[in-house]
């Protein structure tokens, strides 16, 4: 996790409680199996990290983790809360999409993560 943390810090993440929560969430799900309709594959170092550095996206198993829909949203929320500059802007675009899709502010969705999890499962079936 230290390597991931250092790379995230190098593109403008702040070492705050949300970065720690993000890294903990990733570590806690390291062995989560892919489950049809119930999980999302998440890039630990986000795709925008590589785009900001003009590098090819790392799709290796070491940079991927399976997360429930609610944990996936939380992961991006935590990244947003520790990001700065272009990295923060790129993360905020994902939230605008989710807010538009469910017609709720992201804060309301975060408060009701269990409902979000079920909405995602239902939408994929």
What are these regions (language model features)?
Residues 1, 12-15, 68, 109, ...:
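Intrinsic-disorder-associated interaction segments
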Residues 1-40, 75:
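Short cysteine-rich loop/turn motifs with clustered Cys
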Residues 11-14, 25-29, 85, 101, ...:
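Surface-exposed polar/charged interaction patches
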Residues 28-67:
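Histidine-centered nuclease catalytic patch
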Residues 64-89:
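Short Cys/His-centered divalent metal-binding micro-motifs
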Residues 84-104:
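N-terminal accessory alpha/beta regions
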Residues 101-125:
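Secondary-structure boundary/linker elements at domain or insertion junctions
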């Amino acid at each position: 996790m230290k390597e991931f943390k250092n790379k995230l810090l190098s593109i403008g993440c702040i070492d705050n409680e949300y970065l720690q929560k993000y890294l903990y969430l990733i570590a806690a799900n390291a062995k989560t199996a892919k489950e049809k309709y119930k999980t999302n594959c998440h890039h630990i170092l986000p795709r925008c990290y590589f785009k900001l550095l003009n590098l090819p996206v790392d799709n290796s198993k070491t940079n991927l983790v399976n997360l429930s829909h609610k944990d996936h949203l939380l992961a991006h929320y935590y990244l947003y809360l520790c990001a700065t500059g272009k990295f923060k802007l790129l993360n905020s675009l994902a939230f605008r999409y989710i807010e538009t899709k469910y017609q709720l502010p992201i804060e309301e969705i975060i408060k009701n993560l269990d409902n979000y999890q079920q909405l995602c499962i239902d939408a994929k079936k």
